[in-house]
A protein has these predicted regions:
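Short coil/linker segments at helix-helix boundaries
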Residues: 137-141, 163-194
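Bacterial Sec-dependent N-terminal signal peptides
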Residues: 1-26
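Generic structural "secondary-structure junction" signal
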Residues: 22-24, 30, 35-36, 96-98, ...
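Short, surface-exposed recognition loops and adjoining beta-strand edges that mediate ligand/DNA contacts
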Residues: 30-31, 58-81, 165-172, 176
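Membrane-proximal, proline-rich intrinsically disordered regions
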Residues: 17-68
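Conserved, well-structured interaction surfaces
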Residues: 84-163, 190-193
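A structural signal for short, hydrophobic/glycine-enriched beta-strand patches
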Residues: 65-102, 183
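Secretory-pathway/luminal and periplasmic proteins that interact with or process carbohydrate-rich
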Residues: 52-58, 76, 155-165
Length: 194
């Protein structure tokens, strides 16, 4: 009897529970998102929101970490938020492997590639949809596509600027993966002069 009970329990646990799968209300399936111009506009707005976040140009790549690394201002240890002061001090002293600066640098790297992945999804799908799905026809479709390409180029350039040496140092060295497609593969690494 115990054997049957164990086997029955195993069968119940091993079966699929599709009725438990709930799609969150604040998410949308990729196939649904990229079927209308409205979906493409929403996806592009999501890219702009992420670019404007504190992790990128909302702080770290504008007045925050990057300004401290460029020594555009002096740090005052009497300020509130000692952790942010330590990050600024280490960045100004070019100490990029400290416990305060490493998480910021890693966040910049990961967030930029995450945004590039989202942009690549837009580029991947935009040619598969007819211009009639866009409120302003082909002009809007071309505008969204052009913005996506421009944003991807800007983000790759900033990654190169931040994480690769100057071209005069080693023009043929490869330092960063260049991502043109969405997916788990690393991507081709280009030289700084490519």
């Amino acid at each position: 009897m115990k054997k049957i009970l164990y086997m029955l329990s195993f069968v119940l646990l091993a079966t699929s529970c599709d009725w438990l799968a709930i799609t969150p209300e604040n998410s949308i399936d990729e196939d649904d998102l990229f079927t209308t111009g409205y979906g493409f506009r929403n996806a592009l707005n999501g890219v702009y929101l992420k670019i404007g976040s504190r992790d990128l140009y909302g702080e770290n790549l504008s007045w925050g970490f990057l300004s401290a690394a460029a020594q555009e201002y002096l740090t005052d240890n009497s300020q509130q938020g000692q952790n942010s002061v330590q990050i600024s001090k280490d960045a100004a002293d070019f100490i990029y492997n400290s416990t305060s600066t490493q998480p910021v640098i890693q966040t910049i790297w990961e967030t930029q590639y995450s945004v590039i992945a989202n942009i690549n999804k837009i580029i991947e799908h935009i040619d598969n949809i007819d211009k009639s799905e866009f409120a302003f026809g082909e002009d809007e479709k071309n505008l969204i596509k052009a913005e996506a390409y421009a944003l991807r180029a800007m983000l790759h350039f900033d990654l190169l600027r931040l994480f690769a040496p100057a071209p005069a140092t080693n023009p043929t060295g490869t330092y960063l993966p260049y991502r043109e497609k969405f997916g788990p593969e690393i991507g081709e690494q280009l030289s700084v002069t490519a």
